[in-house]
């Protein structure tokens, strides 16, 4: 009788001990397509593209925007790591950093603090010169908001 109770108790405990499913990294980023905001001047566009050496059709510019607070961000593609820094968003401009990416291959952006990842597909990046990546506040449905655009917002 004691053995049966012990077995039932052990079975009950094992059924209660279920592995918790973590949502880390599994949430998909929000994706937007916008060209309806104020544009930077042609002089500012060409200066940015020259600074990043991104004037060719095979390159897009990834712009890290809001909610970056010094956590490590790693941007890489299948060929190499493009960026591994600790960006901080400027409160006035809302810009943390700009990075040139190769738009012929998929690009991964990884937030080392939140253990979240976003993938910028080559198919979408090829269609847009500027890609804005905003980090959503913790606890939201998605870790990032990606905005694809052919319009450069003023960076100053």
Label every PLM stretch briefly.
Residues 1-4:
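Positively charged n-region of N-terminal signal peptides that target proteins for export
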Residues 6-11:
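Sec-dependent N-terminal signal peptides
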Residues 14-16:
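C-terminal motif of bacterial Sec signal peptides marking the signal peptidase cleavage site
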Residues 18-156:
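Terminal leader/tail segments of proteins
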